[in-house]
Amino acid sequence: MPPIYDLFAMIALGFCAALGMGALVSPKWAAGVVRLVADPDPDKPGGFSEFRATYGGLLLLIHLSALIILLQDGLALPYKVIALFPIAMGWLGAGMGRLLSLVLDRAENRANGLIPVWIPMELILGFAILAPAFGLGASLE
């Protein structure tokens, strides 16, 4: 059984990859999750392509590739952490940006909506993906 730190990362990476798969298969679903309109300007179509590409393919493959790297038994933990670090920082940055928006963009946001839900979710995902790094010191002894 993998260490508990790895399990946290595996669950978070699998969850994020599943979100990406959902967006890839159903861009309407992705539009509802992120509360954006696919084509707000009829003169500039292509919104569904963006949902499939950015929220779908990118999210799916970046998390799936990190999960595959994490599952490599022969690969030393520091190398796995190098693969996980930028993805974790992306989620932590998303949470930080959303927190700033909650504080600074009150008028533009009109209502908090799901912002207070997404902030802890993004922070949890970031720390969960980075969790194997917390066991790094023990593995080097």
Describe the residue ranges of each PLM region.
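Juxtamembrane boundary at the C-terminal end of a transmembrane helix
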Residues: 129-141
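Cytosolic, membrane-interface loops and tails of multi-pass inner-membrane proteins
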Residues: 26-48, 101, 105
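Membrane-interfacial loop-to-transmembrane-helix junctions in polytopic alpha-helical membrane proteins
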Residues: 1-7, 44-50, 54, 75-82, ...
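Small-residue-rich segments of transmembrane alpha-helices in multi-pass membrane proteins
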Residues: 50, 113-129
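Alpha-helical transmembrane segments of multi-pass membrane proteins
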Residues: 16-22, 62, 90-94, 118
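Transmembrane helix-loop-helix
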Residues: 69-106, 110-116
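Core segments of alpha-helical transmembrane spans in multipass integral membrane proteins
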Residues: 47-71, 89-93
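N-terminal signal-anchor transmembrane alpha helix
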Residues: 6-25
